[in-house]
């Protein structure tokens, strides 16, 4: 072969390799950009091979400062972990302190690993800080507790009553949040009929959130499922009056729903107020137990929508099952349905006539993750 012919061939080969590498890099970047708009199991883990991955970024003097356990890792691609230890052995002694370390307009998953303990604080994850995970002790959610005790009649810094939504022990305002193995708690004890004792443990107003094996504990208005699409999987939720309420579109799958009512109360109070709103609560394969004689749901909104499917319902449900919130005009607008539930509390003989026993075709849109458009943002 002539030298003149060999050189162009080598150049073409090198050029081809460079193009392939560039394409591979572009594909990797594209995949990274795509992945941040999903929540996966990886976003709920911090321990691999028995060690904690300690890499995170904080913003200091408007510049990125990166701490990385692996000096060879690319700081823009690694998963980042901030450790919270109330005893001082981590990066922050408070959960809020760890949240504050995350830069505004964050575009990468940041995992906040919260070591066991009771963290008595109010926590807000602001809208400007998406892609945050709260991760506790994977063996038991009760080991890691975020707890506070505000109630609606308490006065805020402005001298005005807090009202319900400002009582939340933990407020999630950002998108693509997820949590596992954490207890969210409000310690205020309330009974049906008491005034000013609404006390929220967890409020979610951000879109596309996942809660896996968390506990949410309270009495009245425990879980404010306010707005957005949310997935609760294998969670434990406890309260007595309207203890799951709001206007989100949420799927509760394989959850334990536990009533602590001494007399009467209600599980769900959905606030859909227009037939054009694409919102609702769907409870699938849940175990509903506890005490009292409570409603499955109350019509907080004119077009409230709540469905129970394939659930075990203990003998704690008042025979009528559902309440129109003393607004009889809502009876023809709400969507309160049950499908294939079992247990004494599932007997529909005494149900209000404006609730529905759903058919298989009618319940199908409520049964899976497609109810919350999970194919667009879940990789679980």
From Swiss-Prot:
The pathway entry for this protein reads as: Glycan metabolism; pectin degradation; 2-dehydro-3-deoxy-D-gluconate from pectin: step 1/5
User: Known EC number(s)?
Assistant: 3.1.1.11
Where, in this chain's numbering, is substrate bound? 164, 198, 298, 300
Q: Which residues cross the membrane?
A: none
Question: Which residue pairs form cystines in this protein?
Answer: 235-255
Q: Which family does it belong to?
A: Belongs to the pectinesterase family.
The answer to whether UniProt assigns keyword Signal to this entry is yes
**So which residues are the signal peptide here?**
1-26
Phenotype of gene-disrupted mutants: The mature pollen grains are arranged in a tetrad.
Which reactions are catalysed by this chain? [(1->4)-alpha-D-galacturonosyl methyl ester](n) + n H2O = [(1->4)-alpha-D-galacturonosyl](n) + n methanol + n H(+)
The places in or outside the cell where this protein is found are: Secreted, Cell wall
Which molecular function term from Gene Ontology is one that the record holds?
pectinesterase activity
Supply the name of the protein: Pectinesterase QRT1
């Amino acid at each position: 072969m002539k030298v003149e012919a060999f050189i162009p061939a080598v150049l073409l080969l090198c050029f081809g390799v460079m193009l392939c590498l560039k394409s591979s890099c572009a594909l990797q970047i594209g995949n990274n950009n795509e992945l941040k708009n999903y929540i996966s199991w990886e976003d709920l883990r911090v321990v691999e091979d028995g060690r904690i991955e300690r890499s995170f970024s904080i913003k200091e003097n408007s510049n990125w400062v990166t701490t990385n356990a692996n000096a060879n890792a690319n700081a823009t691609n690694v998963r980042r972990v901030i450790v919270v230890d109330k005893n001082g052995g981590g990066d922050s002694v408070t959960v809020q302190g760890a949240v504050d370390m995350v830069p505004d307009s964050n575009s990468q998953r940041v995992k906040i690993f919260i070591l066991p303990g009771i963290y008595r604080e109010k926590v807000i994850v602001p809208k400007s800080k998406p892609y945050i995970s709260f991760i506790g002790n994977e063996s038991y959610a009760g080991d890691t507790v975020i707890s506070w005790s505000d109630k609606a009649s308490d006065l805020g810094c402005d001298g005005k009553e807090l009202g319900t939504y400002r009582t939340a022990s933990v407020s999630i305002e950002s998108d693509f949040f997820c949590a596992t193995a954490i207890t969210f708690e409000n310690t205020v004890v309330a009974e049906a009929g008491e005034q000013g004792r609404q006390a929220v443990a967890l409020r979610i107003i951000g879109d596309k959130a996942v809660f896996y094996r968390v506990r949410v504990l309270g009495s009245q208005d425990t879980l404010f499922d306010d707005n957005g699409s949310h997935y609760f999987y294998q969670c434990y939720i406890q309260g007595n009056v309207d203890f799951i309420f709001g206007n989100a579109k949420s799927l509760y799958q394989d959850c334990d729903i536990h009533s602590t009512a001494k007399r009467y109360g209600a599980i769900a109070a959905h606030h859909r107020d227009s037939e054009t709103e694409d919102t609702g609560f769907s409870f699938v394969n849940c175990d509903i137990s506890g005490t009292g004689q409570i409603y499955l749901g109350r019509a907080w909104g004119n077009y409230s929508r709540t469905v129970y499917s394939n659930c075990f319902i203990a003998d704690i449900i008042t025979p009528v099952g559902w309440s129109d919130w003393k607004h009889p005009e809502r009876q023809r607008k709400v969507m309160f349905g049950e499908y294939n539930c079992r247990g004494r509390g599932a007997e529909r003989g005494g149900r209000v006539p404006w609730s529905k026993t759903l058919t298989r075709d009618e319940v199908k849109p409520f049964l899976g993750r497609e109810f919350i458009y999970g194919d667009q943002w879940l990789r679980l």
